[in-house]
Design a protein with these regions (language model features):
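A short, surface-exposed loop/turn module that caps and links secondary-structure elements
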Residues: 29-54
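A periodicity- and composition-biased signal for non-globular, repetitive helical segments
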Residues: 8, 27, 33, 49-50, ...
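Enriched for short, Lys/Arg-rich terminal
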Residues: 2-7, 11, 19-22, 55-81
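N-terminal first-folded block
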Residues: 6-38
Length: 81
């Protein structure tokens, strides 16, 4: 699968702490290999928009859609508790 970053996602990622960025890139490698990789905890977030959520860390999540052979990254933010 190919990874596509939205412009907004790139900006949001740059604003996250460096430790979160490092964890994100590690998780992204897992996503590229297998969406069911255990540490991702990937799940459908919104059925109507085909939006998925995956774990970066305990406190951070990223959001993406699956379009053909692409994962399109849309958002990264703190996980609400």
């Amino acid at each position: 699968m190919k990874i596509v970053y939205s412009g907004r996602f790139t900006e949001l990622l740059e604003e996250t702490p460096l430790s979160v960025q490092k964890a994100f890139y590690k998780q992204l490698r897992f996503l590229a290999g297998d969406i069911r990789y255990p540490s991702l905890h990937a799940k459908k977030y919104d059925e109507s928009g085909n939006l998925w959520q995956a774990r970066v860390t305990k406190d951070w999540r990223f959001y993406f859609t699956v379009e053909g052979d692409e994962y399109r990254l849309h958002d990264i933010k703190r996980h609400p508790k």
